[in-house]
């Protein structure tokens, strides 16, 4: 099959939500509808602990939050879907942000009782920057919820995006009876308790069908009146607005009961964009180009406790990956052979024989691959727009057993390569300082150091409030700066000079004193 045909059948997207809106449940149900798993909730770990397929790291299982981005591929009808599960917890902004650079569209999950929550607002800002098309699933309709019109108003006013309802709920909570599909003019009736298997919902054709009155009684005429109001007050779905990220189609349902998910998935494969062109520092790369290219948006250490491995997740931007092919690693200016790239089904990994634009493959990484790296078939361009953020929180890392210094350094280096934490090594001392965007990161690192590297560490406070990357073209100025400010300077994991400011005032004074130097909050990988 040609590159064009392979590209056209693919959909690569991420699910975004506030914690507890039901993102992991919906992820699992999408896999269920795609036939990737047979029974919901039955994927067991060796200890037979029940946990959702996509939250596969020990700490995630204990805490019930998605800590790292998981990649899952599954077929649905004539399509192949690549689903990137993003961390729902507030501390994992960076990882989520980078994941959103690797997708062509997003699915937003909203809890019908809570509406728009802070984390959703933050993620929407990222999507807006990239004009990412967004579909919305309003979940938990089987519980007591806020009025649906109110939820739409809130999405429009807070997230600044037009809402186009595609399905509309009939009742809510105990009185939830189903959904009306505005485009199909059909009603799907709700039967609670279908948690584990996918079954066909009973369907009634036409809102004016007398059969509806038999099934719903007085609710039928209420529904007809409500739909008239909804059609008058909301935007009709139009694909162009959706693809520009200006309008979001809205679907209602109950993911835990498998209800409303099929309608969402059908609309998704039909309307969501296939893999799109990608910007580089020299030109736009189109997916249908013959030559292979791709970029690394995430690195994950120790995905399989049985193998001490690091996997670099690469999004294919153009051409075809074939097992054993040679690819050019642009940053290192050298050709490498890729023999054993992986594809993923949440923790189940298989060797990829081939992969196409939109697919995510895993490359075994022995420390040479970094986030943001570009691979091509000889061309020397670099994909742009994969950011690194300055840390906001800092801790000094101390060993409980001083003899484990080497293992500590190895662990911290490998874990910081994943991009969720940053390791700083001060110029003036042998201290190790860990920086993160959120507090939970420190717990994750301590937990993983102990479990994956057999190193116990403790944290101490350190006199650093923020970090800035130091950029200066004038070597003489930079040398003078290094000498005068060495006590506040460190190298990050990538060997980039960083200023660790003991206070905001100190940073402002230093920036004023050194106008030739750029103090940057973000850095492109």
UniProtKB/Swiss-Prot annotation:
Location relative to the cell: Cytoplasm
GO MF annotation terms: GTP binding; GTPase activity; guanosine tetraphosphate binding; translation release factor activity, codon nonspecific; translation release factor activity, codon specific
Keywords, ordered alphabetically: Cytoplasm, GTP-binding, Nucleotide-binding, Protein biosynthesis
Residues of the tr-type G domain: 8-276
UniProt: GTP binding residues: 17-24, 85-89, 139-142
Gene3D superfamilies for the chain: P-loop containing nucleotide triphosphate hydrolases, Peptide chain release factor 3, domain III
Main localization, broad class: cytoplasm
Highest taxon above the source species: Bacteria
Any one annotated GO CC term: cytosol
Pfam families the UniProt entry points to: EF-G_D2 (PF22042), GTP_EFTU (PF00009), RF3_C (PF16658)
GO BP field: regulation of translational termination
Described function: Increases the formation of ribosomal termination complexes and stimulates activities of RF-1 and RF-2. It binds guanine nucleotides and has strong preference for UGA stop codons. It may interact directly with the ribosome. The stimulation of RF-1 and RF-2 is significantly reduced by GTP and GDP, but not by GMP.
HAMAP family recorded: Rel_fac_3
Assigned protein family: Belongs to the TRAFAC class translation factor GTPase superfamily. Classic translation factor GTPase family. PrfC subfamily.
Designated name of the protein: Peptide chain release factor 3
Species of provenance: Coxiella burnetii (strain CbuK_Q154) (Coxiella burnetii (strain Q154))
Lineage, highest ranks first: Bacteria, Pseudomonadati, Pseudomonadota, Gammaproteobacteria, Legionellales
